[in-house]
Structures are given as C-alpha cells and as structure tokens.
Amino acid sequence: MPTTVISGFTHNFLGKAPVWYKQVILLFLVINPIVMYLLGPGVAGWLLIGEFIFTLAMALKCYPLLPGGLLAVEALLIGLTSADAVYHEVLTNFPVILLLMFMVAGIYFMKELLLVTFTQILVGVRSKSALSLLFCSAAAVLSAFLDALTVTAVIISVAVGFFSVYHKVASGKGYQQKDHNTNSDDEVIELHREDLENFRAFLRSLLMHGAIGTALGGVATMVGEPQNLLIAKVVGWDFAGFFLHMAPVSIPVLFAGLATCWALEKLRWFGYGGRLPKPVRRVLEEFADNEKARRTKSDQAALWIQAVAAVILVFGLAFHIAEVGLIGLLVIILITSFTGVTDEHQIGKAFQESLPFTSLLVVFFAVVAVIHEQHLFKPIIDYVLALPEGQQPGMFFIANGLLSMISDNVFVATVYISEVKQALDAGSISYEHFQTLAVAINTGTNLPSVATPNGQAAFLFLLTSAIAPLVRLSYGRMVIMALPYTIVMGGVGLYMVTHAF
C-alpha cells in the first residue's frame, strides 16, 4: 500500500498494470516532445504510431484506451494534429460509432434467443469437427448481417454462460447459485480439475473458430466490420453493391476458411481438437433441459419478440432503410418495449461492452488525424500508385495486410481508403480502378489481420473480454491458433485480388 501521496499517485497511475509498463508509457510521454523538437513532426508521428501499436499489443496489461488516450492527448498538445482535425475524423466515421453504440447494445437484448440457439447447437451436435464447422459458419453468416463485434459479443456471452455453469458444479455448487467467483479455481474439487482444463481447451477452440468465422463473413458485407461501413461510404456502395464487389474474393476465402476449420479439428494442430468431456456434457444437457422446463409463457413470448426483431434487423440491413446504428436503436426500442425491460439500470448494462471500445475507436481517429496532418503514409501510397495498374491491387492487399497484423484494421482501412480517395479526387486514378483498390483495401485489412488480436477489432474485443482469462486465452495463444487461418485466408485472398479483377 502507498505510504505517501506521491507513491499514491504512482500506484494509481494505470492501476494494476505492471510497473515496467507504467515506466514505458511515461518514457513515451517524455520523449515525444523531445523528438518533435529535435527531429520534427514526421519522425515524431511515426514514433507515435509505433507507441500506439505497442499499447494495442499489450492490451492484456492495460486496456489501450488509457495509454493510447494519453498519447493522443499529447499529440494534440505538441501540435502533431489539432482538435478540429480529430473532430473531422470522428464526424467522418460517425456511422461506425453509431453502429458500435447501438447495434452491439441491441444484440444484448437478443442474448436469450441466441443463447438458446447456441445451447441447442452445442448439446445437440456431438461431433467436434461438425460443431466447430457449425460455429464457424454460423458466426460467418451472422457477421454478414450483424457486424463481427456484435457476433463476437454473442459468442462471448454464450461461452461465459457455459463456463460459469460447469465451474459452479466443479466447485461443488448448484448451477443456479448466484454468488460464485468463476475467476478463481480455489474451490474446484480435485476430481473435476482435469475435466475443467479440457473444457477450457474445448471452449478456446470454439471461441477461435467463431472469431475466425466473424472475419470470414465480416469481409463480405458493408455491416460486417466497422471499417467496411467506412469504405462503403467513401466509395458510394450500398449493401448489395458492396457484397457483389467483394464476392470474387470473399466467397473463395469463405470456403477455404471452413475447410481449414474442419482440417484443424481432425488433425488437432495449433491447439485445436479439444473435446467436450462427458461429465461436462451431462451438466450442460441437464442445464439446458432445466432452463427449458423453467421457461414461462412470458419467457416464450420474449423469445418470439426477439426472433421478430432479428428478422426486422436483417431486412432493415439488407434494404438499408436507415443508418446501421439507427437500426440497432430500433431493435433496442422494440425488444425493451415488448419484453418489459423498463428499468434504466437494466437498459444501461447493454452499453457496458461497447462504449469502452467506442471510446478507443475515437482515440484511433486521433492517431489517424496525425497521419493525415503529417502525410505519413503518402510515400507508401505514392510508391504503390506508381506501379503498373495490374500490380496495384495485390500490393495494396499486402501493404494493408502487413499493417493490419500489427495495428487495428479499422485504423489501417481509415488511413488507406482516405489516401486513395485523395488520389481519385486529384484525377490520378479512374473510378473503376478506385473501386478495385477499395476491394483490395477491404480484403487486405479484413483477412490477414486475423494474425494478431490487435489486427481485428473483434479479436481485440475477445482478448479484453471476461471470457479470455477464464479459458486462459492469452495474446500469444491467440496468435498461434490464428496462424493456419492467416496463411490460408491471406494466401487465397491475395490470389483472388490479383487474378479476379
């Protein structure tokens, strides 16, 4: 415990983050103004990008909003960008912010329906390969309409539900007991420890298959990933137009990804292949039967309302009746009104998952503003645009893919699409070629970016969620488990981008 006010300040700074991490962030904050003064804004800007990527890579040490936010504020103070430029970036990406605020919250109120659906899938399908394929393909289909973050939130809530049920039983308690700490294994009975570890491995593989599924489906439509909406707005595509332009790349990659999913479960490579222990299956089946028996007529009516809202959501997105985030708000209004969720605090819980990430996204946009103000990516863009036209899509795919592996794909896509749009406005490229480059940018940011958690917004969401520590899903483990998918999806995507247009 701190003994002085000064030690209290140092203890409170970035909370429970390791001391070395706090020291590194302080070092960044000290050297940035010095570099700006001695070496100029160009070098300081690139240094800031490197520091920001570091905070994303260290997401398990400290949520990136805090250190990343401090770096963004400092960038404003030392003149790397301006408040007006940040505001302009936020305004440009306002549809993405609306999506995160309301769509993820809207799906929160559909969790009962989705939990029932995924429970039936999990206890009904006994083959792990078939189950993994079903999870991956279900996540892909859902991501095409709901956005990857939303689907990841659903998969996380399902996994947390299943894990907490068995953890209570393994600790010698009934699964209806409310007061239980799933973060601690201290109360777990020795007899159940091996089954609990095997269950963790089983859930880890399902979570990763599901997360990969969100990338497979998310690349295909304008609402699948936050950056898709951004690209669609810049290019001028509607829902159908976006899908048709992406299909030559997204459809072959989908089939290649599903084949990889099946192969990994059969071969049990890269941490996959964990089976559901029989005692755990019995507990989950009993839980599912008990939940079904306890379901009242009121609960059944609520499930019907959620199903109707899901249909309205899909049609609303397909025909683009309103901005995506506003359709999410419609879902919130419909479900809460017709299921009797009237308490303000109960409604507020729906926004807890999405708002920290929304805040982090605004910090991304501050860094994007620095890149724009200092023209940091202009040399790279100019180099690629100077290549023969036939080579440009492939090079954009590779450049976006490599950057998206170490940085967030929303961040990379925002930068590249706006830079290419400037080239279009300047008359350097035709609109048809601009559309081809937009496909390369979208697929380049969506497919190879599964390599690391900081590449995909949904993966970062998974890594920083409640389920990651419960099933021992660390940054390094995610990278290893994503490797085969990265190779297959990146390879097939690059081939299609260079040969399909």
Swiss-Prot record:
InterPro entries: Na+/H+_antiporter_NhaB. The keyword Iron-sulfur does not apply. Disulfide bonds: none annotated. The chain crosses the membrane at residues 24-44, 46-66, 90-110, 145-165, 206-226, 239-259, 302-319, 351-371, 395-415, 450-470, 478-498. GO terms for molecular function: sodium:proton antiporter activity. It is a multi-pass membrane protein. It is found in: Cell inner membrane. GO terms for cellular component: plasma membrane. It catalyses: 2 Na(+)(in) + 3 H(+)(out) = 2 Na(+)(out) + 3 H(+)(in). The keyword Membrane applies. Pfam families: NhaB (PF06450). Keywords: Antiport, Cell inner membrane, Cell membrane, Ion transport, Membrane, Sodium, Sodium transport, Transmembrane, Transmembrane helix, Transport. NCBIfam families: PRK09547.1 (NF007093). PANTHER family: NA(+)_H(+) ANTIPORTER NHAB, TRANSPORTER ARSB-RELATED. Belongs to the NhaB Na(+)/H(+) (TC 2.A.34) antiporter family. Na(+)/H(+) antiporter that extrudes sodium in exchange for external protons. This is Na(+)/H(+) antiporter NhaB. It comes from Marinobacter nauticus (strain ATCC 700491 / DSM 11845 / VT8).
